[in-house]
């Protein structure tokens, strides 16, 4: 090859126009495949999804238990010395003569409850009380818009993204049925909420030394239609504000819930000034089914997109798991059982509450009328008392003959 000769370049088999057409066709094909298989693809069955979520939750719970057991073996209760020093402090001589603190064993003995042989309870009476409470809550919600206002404020909070328009609640149904609690049993658990195992013999003294407590577990079953429907708009603010608007409507319904509710109490700690707390959570074997309906678009609408239903359901399950499914739990501080002045109601406090609950001018008038009525009633009672005493008081010239005496005539 001579130095001044140029290599021969191969001629392209497709022209620029043909390449552009092939590229456009491939993009359209990819978009169509994405819409068909990703958005409108058939979702997995509810049984498969529920079993997959249950296995994930179970593996997470087992990993948490293993980490707790490994921490126990590595750390030999570093806070035991501090707890012992708190117990050895000098207590008040006034309360020293009282009964000793009840342990798990003494509580079970005094209530005639045997953990190994006691049969689970049906809780029929508790279901009636819960049903009455829920029925009253539903009746109050129908005559008051407070729950609707609270939901609207919560949905349109400060953390709403800029691409989302105002969210409006279009439907709210609190259902018609009631949850059924059953199969209640008492389970001794340790300080971390782990049971002692079905194959191990329960030792109340050892459980008390290890900081154990008693936990009530009951099955919960609810089959109902609790619905919340929303409407909003997706805003496209690029390249300029409100370039496009896409209306979106979503309705989420809870159709079934079944699981195991665990309730226990954490006693107060006087050294840290912590109140007594009620702790509750759900075990990882729960089942929560939703019915999700969606409507996207204004003219050509897409109804009940499966992928939207999957995303919303997955987000709701994650929200529930992160709050009240083991190993996570919810704490509710309980008020003190001893009577206090600040918790007393009635008398002048009732009048003051009425005055505070109304406007300043109207509340003052109502409070003034109430005080006037109270004074009138008090004066009427005092007048009636004086009249009864006056009629009973003998006059000066009255003489009452003694038994056996003779009447003397003037």
Curated annotation (Swiss-Prot):
GO molecular function: lipid binding; lipid transfer activity
PANTHER family the record matches: SMP-LTD DOMAIN-CONTAINING PROTEIN, TEX2 PROTEIN-RELATED
Family: Belongs to the MMM1 family.
Subunit structure as annotated in this protein's UniProt entry: Homodimer. Component of the ER-mitochondria encounter structure (ERMES) or MDM complex, composed of MMM1, MDM10, MDM12 and MDM34. A MMM1 homodimer associates with one molecule of MDM12 on each side in a pairwise head-to-tail manner, and the SMP-LTD domains of MMM1 and MDM12 generate a continuous hydrophobic tunnel for phospholipid trafficking.
GO biological process: aminophospholipid transport; mitochondrial genome maintenance; mitochondrial outer membrane translocase complex assembly; mitochondrion organization; mitochondrion-endoplasmic reticulum membrane tethering; protein insertion into mitochondrial outer membrane; telomere maintenance
Cystine pairs: none
Cytoplasmic-side positions: 41-410
Biased composition (Basic and acidic residues): 387-398
InterPro entries, per database record: Mmm1, MMM1_dom, SMP_LBD
Name of the protein: Maintenance of mitochondrial morphology protein 1
Biased composition (Polar residues): 71-87
Highest taxon of source: Eukaryota
Transmembrane segments: 20-40
Topology within the bilayer: Single-pass type I membrane protein
Keyword Mitochondrion among record annotations: no
All copies of domain SMP-LTD, residue ranges: 119-335
PROSITE patterns xref list: SMP (PS51847)
Cell compartment(s), UniProt: Endoplasmic reticulum membrane
Domains as described in the record: The SMP-LTD domain is a barrel-like domain that can bind various types of glycerophospholipids in its interior and mediate their transfer between two adjacent bilayers.
Keywords: Endoplasmic reticulum, Lipid transport, Lipid-binding, Membrane, Transmembrane, Transmembrane helix, Transport
Region forming the signal peptide: none
GO cellular component, one term: endoplasmic reticulum membrane
Region Disordered, annotated ranges: 71-98, 380-410
UniProt topological domain (Lumenal) ranges: 1-19
Annotated function: Component of the ERMES/MDM complex, which serves as a molecular tether to connect the endoplasmic reticulum (ER) and mitochondria. Components of this complex are involved in the control of mitochondrial shape and protein biogenesis, and function in nonvesicular lipid trafficking between the ER and mitochondria. The MDM12-MMM1 subcomplex functions in the major beta-barrel assembly pathway that is responsible for biogenesis of all outer membrane beta-barrel proteins, and acts in a late step after the SAM complex.
Major location category of this protein: endoplasmic reticulum
């Amino acid at each position: 090859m001579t130095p001044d000769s140029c290599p021969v370049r191969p001629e392209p088999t497709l022209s620029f126009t043909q390449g552009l057409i092939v590229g456009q066709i491939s993009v359209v094909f990819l978009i169509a495949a994405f819409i068909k298989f990703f958005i409108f693809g058939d979702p997995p069955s509810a049984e498969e999804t529920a079993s997959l979520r249950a296995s994930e939750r179970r593996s997470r719970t087992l990993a948490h238990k293993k980490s707790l057991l490994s921490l126990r073996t590595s750390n030999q209760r570093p806070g035991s010395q501090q707890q012992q020093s708190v117990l050895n402090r000098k207590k008040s001589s006034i309360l020293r003569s009282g009964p000793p603190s009840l342990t798990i064993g003494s509580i079970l003995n005094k209530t005639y409850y045997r953990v190994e042989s006691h049969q689970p309870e049906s809780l029929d009476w508790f279901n009636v009380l819960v049903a009455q409470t829920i029925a009253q809550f539903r009746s109050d919600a129908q005559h008051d818009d407070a729950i609707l206002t609270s939901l609207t404020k919560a949905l349109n909070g400060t953390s709403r993204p800029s691409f989302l328009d105002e969210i409006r609640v279009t439907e709210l149904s609190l259902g018609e049925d009631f949850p059924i609690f059953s199969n209640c049993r008492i389970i001794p658990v340790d300080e971390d909420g782990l049971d002692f195992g079905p194959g191990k013999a329960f030792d109340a003294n050892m459980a008390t030394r290890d900081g154990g407590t008693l936990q009530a577990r009951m099955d919960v079953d609810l089959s109902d239609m609790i619905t919340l429907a929303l409407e909003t708009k997706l805003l496209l603010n690029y390249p300029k504000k409100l370039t496009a608007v896409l209306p979106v409507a979503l309705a989420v319904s809870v159709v079934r819930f079944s699981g195991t509710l665990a309730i226990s109490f954490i006693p107060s700690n006087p050294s840290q000034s912590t109140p007594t707390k009620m702790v509750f959570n759900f075990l990882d074997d729960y089942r929560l089914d939703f019915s999700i309906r969606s409507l996207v678009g204004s003219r050509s609408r897409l109804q009940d997109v499966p992928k939207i239903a999957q995303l919303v359901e997955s987000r709701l399950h994650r929200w529930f798991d992160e709050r009240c499914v083991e190993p996570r739990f919810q704490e509710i501080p309980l008020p003190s059982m001893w009577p206090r002045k600040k918790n007393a109601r009635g008398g002048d406090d009732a009048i003051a509450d009425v005055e505070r609950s109304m406007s300043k001018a109207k509340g003052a008038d109502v409070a003034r009328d109430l005080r006037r009525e109270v004074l009138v009633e008090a004066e009427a009672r005092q007048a009636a008392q004086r009249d009864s005493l006056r009629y009973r008081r003998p006059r000066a010239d009255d003489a009452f003959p003694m038994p056996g005496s003779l009447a003397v005539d003037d």
